[in-house]
């Protein structure tokens, strides 16, 4: 059993924010693997299905980014999912735009969504860091991550989503 988590903020005006790239990845996984219709459960939008013969859950927390851990803990406790079977997709300023880095455990590196998950389930889970790059002009990081992607960046996010979908093997 696996749990895919996409981090983001649940407001309609946040849909194309850099901070919401995790939600975009979950939407792509849901579509690619024909997971169930999203249902509001465990303080998130939950889908279920199978990838190969493996049971999969995918969730977009509705608790806002900085409280994502609450949603994840409820879900893993209910379905008895080990933290080691959780894969979190999230934005990362320290990774060049269009690049992906995966890691298991470690620090939150200042990402409040990851810090929240660490607080509620520990650090023994996988993270897929999706590069959004750093701001090109003098802009606060908090403002940058809440800006919408440019059109050409959205095309890059689609390529990243396709690459992740092709890489999912259980």
Q: What name fits each language-model region?
A:
Residues 151-152:
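A hydrophobic, small-residue-rich beta->alpha segment in the mid-to-C-terminal subdomain
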Residues 2-104, 115, 119-128, 135-140, ...:
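Nucleotide and nucleotide-moiety/phosphate-recognizing core
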């Amino acid at each position: 059993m696996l749990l895919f988590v996409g981090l983001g903020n649940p407001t309609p005006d946040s849909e194309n924010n850099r901070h919401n790239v995790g939600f975009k990845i979950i939407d792509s996984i849901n579509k690619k693997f024909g997971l169930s219709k999203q249902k509001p459960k465990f303080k998130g939008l939950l889908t279920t299905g199978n990838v190969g013969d493996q049971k999969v859950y995918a969730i977009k927390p509705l608790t806002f980014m900085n409280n994502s851990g609450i949603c994840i803990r409820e879900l893993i406790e209910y379905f008895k999912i080990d933290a080691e079977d959780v894969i979190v997709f999230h934005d990362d300023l320290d990774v060049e735009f269009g690049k992906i880095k995966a890691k298991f455990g470690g620090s939150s590196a200042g990402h409040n969504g990851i810090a929240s998950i660490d607080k509620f389930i520990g650090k023994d889970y996988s993270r897929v860091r999706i590069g959004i790059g750093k701001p090109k002009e003098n802009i606060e990081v908090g403002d940058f991550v809440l800006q919408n992607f440019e059109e050409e960046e959205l095309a890059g996010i689609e390529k990243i989503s396709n690459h992740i979908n092709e890489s999912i093997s259980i």
